[in-house]
């Protein structure tokens, strides 16, 4: 049954909804239930007409708190998606309690991002936003960041509301959007969970993001920047900024090429500061050597009492290193904590032992002006279709 305890779900059913008749046949419970709090449409593909009807129905759900619009446009053309998204978000904008929005795995690109930007800049209730794998790129990504910065001003009005969760991964945000994102984080400084993995951000962009943006978010509990390229410059910046986030529960920087020296700097920062709540530490594939893991083991012993998961696979020390054994003994004594399987450890080459993977601070696109990406004012027209009146349509089908 689709509706259950104020939840309506079509999640993962693989429906291809084209006509009004097809849509209305599967949303009867959604229409009839007055107190819907959560709607899950993910894993289906919706036409423009389907989204128009759904948008009008969603508009009536005044208790709505959570919507999942992930993966709802598979097989839809680039011309369809902007109009379909506009209908959905237009309806959602009337739901004054809707604080959690999932929009991942939809090919918005630059064109379909326009109705998204318009929605994000003015949906005051927004607290949790999930926006991963949307093909934004640096230009549209910067516009999304500026929309959230604009939203912060609206949310500051009494009574204040704050964005708490931002997940924006696999969107090719790159260095060119980092100043916009930094401004966003300065404005949205009550964030507790930030995940931006796999965005092609290089070391200069990482430095901008950490130094001038995320440093303002003193309440951070989760920071995930996995699979971006830190190298030594980014690792130095992370180590320097780490004390700004005393409430961290999860720090995820696997696949970031921290480098041997960078790994030691990060481990030392963990040792020098008490992260009493840190439970998850992801450090895979970062070139961390036996000296780095030795410092890390000391940190776990003295300043990281709550660690439950430590990921170290793919680094350049032996799985039987005495520091690894020390960490395992600490976890055993505490009766909590686990190290991942160290089954893909790297060997330290002669080149690695004599050279650090780093770059001068004026390299890596630092000569580019990252300020020249401006947010465009969005005025996205709704394509009106003659003869379509949703209220009349619903009355005719005896569903209202």
Per-region residue spans from a language model:
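Leucine-rich tandem repeat or coiled-coil scaffolds
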Residues: 1-400
